[in-house]
Amino acid sequence: MIILKNISKSYGGKAVLDNVNIEIPGSGVFGIFGASGQGKTTLIRLLCGLEKPDGGEIIGSDGMNFSVVFQEDRLFPSLTALGNVSLVSDEATARRLLDLVGLHGSEDKYPDELSGGMSRRVAIARALAYGGDALILDEPFKGLESELKEHIGKLIGEYAQTKPVIIVTHDEYGKSLTKNSVILS
């Protein structure tokens, strides 16, 4: 379980998060919802240790390895889809995961040859390949059609059986996957 107690974070004197309290279970899908500019991405950055809170404490995340997909897919442009996933796994695992996310036959494509939804799936495959102690997905269903959303949703559900999956989404299907959630406002 990860506990955020009285978390506050400001940028340039403007509070983005103010006295936020959240308990994230050790498994299952946890949702972070809210309008744009409400601190969802900041909360993710705090959870993974990319930033420190101005106040409060985060309990239970010390030493955790987070596997993260941010809003921007952050694929390496000089590497193929297979190369991007193989950075964190062996080639056989990378091929299997690309197959699982519906990209069989696209392994040798470079990021600039992929659609937005395909890039998103490469990023998700890479995050799954990395493993980590928890999976954090910022808008995992962006650019995906309904059938692919359900397919990716099943993969997320399987992963969440043993580890926490934290998703930030505006997508109604994505929201339906969560067992617990918080709305930032």
Located regions from the model:
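Conserved structural motif at the start of ABC-family nucleotide-binding domains
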Residues: 2, 17-19
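The feature captures the beta-strand-to-loop junction immediately N-terminal to the Walker
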Residues: 33-35
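Helix-to-loop junction immediately C-terminal to a conserved catalytic motif
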Residues: 48
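Conserved ABC ATPase "signature" region
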Residues: 92-106
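Conserved ABC ATPase signature
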Residues: 110-114, 118
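Hydrophobic anchor residue at the start of the ABC signature
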Residues: 124
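ABC-family nucleotide-binding domains
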Residues: 138, 145
